Amino acid sequence: MASNMLQLSLPPLSSSSSSLPFLSSSVYVLPFTHQRRHFSFFNVQNYRFRLSRSTSLGPLFVNKEEDSATYAVTEEEEDNDDDDPDPQSLEYVSQIKRVLELLKRNRDMLFGEVKLTIMIEDPRDVERRRLLGIDDENAPTRDDLAAALEEINEGKVPKDFAALQMLAEEMNSWPNLEVEATKQNKPGRSLYAKATDTGIDPKEAAKRLKIDWDSAAEIDESAESDEPDVPPALGYGALYLVSAFPIIIGISVVLILFYNSLQ
């Protein structure tokens, strides 16, 4: 078995190639096969060349400093993109903020009410787009519009330009945006108070309506100055008379029967 083995010595590795793997032994054993007659010095040299070439290829190293620098540059570019929004986006944001301010001043609408209104979609518009065949599946949804409105309320510029544009168009088309809401009139007498003569206690009215004492006093004065709906000539006498008819008829029947029994 020892006669069938050939030992080859490899040249020592250079100390400059520090990245090459360390070889524990410089001797490799080549087994002989049954085709011994074809073995030659040229074959040994070829095998030795291939072996040395395979061992000379060290592991592939990645420069971590270059990768970290490239990643940092990419993050800086993204931050610059976020810090420099599109001028058209800034214009849409200013329009939406203006509409929100008008709704709060003229309609007394809070931000939650405006957001809820934006999230509700008109079924007529959905049916119209479906019939006309202009319904786009990739168009921004109502949730996207509400998210964009939430970002604008927080002082941010939405990144979704399509949702921002659609939101600005809807906010600008809000009906009667410049018209102020009509103010409520002073509280007057209720229908129950007008139908009864119990009157209104100013203190109780001030507590229930949460108004000042002067306003409650005005309600009491108006209650006293109003004319009654029922004329004083009739009053409740007609009601008592109608209610007494059954009693009068019953007493008359009893008297007639008693008179007939005496005869």
UniProtKB/Swiss-Prot annotation:
Key word Hydrolase present: no
One GO BP annotation of this record: photosystem I assembly
Transit peptide feature, positions: 1-71
Ranges annotated as spanning the membrane: 238-258
Chief location category: plastid
Bilayer disposition of the protein: Single-pass membrane protein
One GO location term (cellular component): chloroplast thylakoid membrane
Location relative to the cell: Plastid, Chloroplast thylakoid membrane
Presence of keyword Transmembrane: yes
Keywords: Chaperone, Chloroplast, Membrane, Plastid, Thylakoid, Transit peptide, Transmembrane, Transmembrane helix
Extra facts: Plants silencing Y3IP1 can grow only on sterile sucrose-containing medium and show a light-green phenotype, very slow growth and delayed development.
Protein family: Belongs to the Y3IP1/CEST family.
Function noted in UniProt: Nuclear genome-encoded factor that participates in photosystem I (PSI) biogenesis. Cooperates with the plastid genome-encoded protein PSI assembly Ycf3 in the assembly of stable PSI units in the thylakoid membrane.
Quaternary organization: Interacts with Ycf3.
Protein name (database record): Ycf3-interacting protein 1, chloroplastic
Native source species: Nicotiana tabacum (Common tobacco)
